[in-house]
Amino acid sequence: MRKGKPARKLGRTAAHRRATLNNLSTQLILHKRIETTEAKAKETRKVIEKMITKARKGTVHAQRDIFKDIRDKKAIRILFEEVVAKVGARNGGYTRVIKLAPRLGDAAKMAIIEFVDYSEAISPAASQKSSKQDRAKRVQGSKKNVDAVAESAE
């Protein structure tokens, strides 16, 4: 009975798929959190978890092995110094995938992938407060525009 392969193809050739996942992994290391499609996030999670497990060894061989995939020296340094120090105590599950609303243009399922132990996540209260402030500014700005249009019409 045919079972199929355990990985998503993402509509790409094997080389393009590997390059995409390596690029997403690099950006995740640099930014600690990225927004992408749900399928790409789940595949990136597989790749980055294996990289962190290798990086926890801290050997030169591990660095060279990871450098085959991530060709950014800054990202390698951050992975070995910051990320491993932060999530090194865990035995796996270094990342989380948070599902978001569908993308407006094509209704693709979107998700955020981020490292678990980083407290840089935006708290809901802070984002809600800033959105209220932005809304107040927009309302004031629109009132000024309405007044200006009314004056010019007279």
Swiss-Prot record:
PANTHER family: LARGE RIBOSOMAL SUBUNIT PROTEIN BL17M, RIBOSOMAL PROTEIN L17. One of its GO terms (biological process) is translation. PROSITE patterns: RIBOSOMAL_L17. One of its GO terms (cellular component) is cytosolic large ribosomal subunit. Belongs to the bacterial ribosomal protein bL17 family. Part of the 50S ribosomal subunit. Contacts protein L32. Residues 125-154 are annotated as: Disordered. It comes from Chlorobium chlorochromatii (strain CaD3). InterPro entries: Ribosomal_bL17, Ribosomal_bL17_CS, Ribosomal_bL17_sf. This is Large ribosomal subunit protein bL17. Keywords: Ribonucleoprotein, Ribosomal protein. One of its GO terms (molecular function) is structural constituent of ribosome.
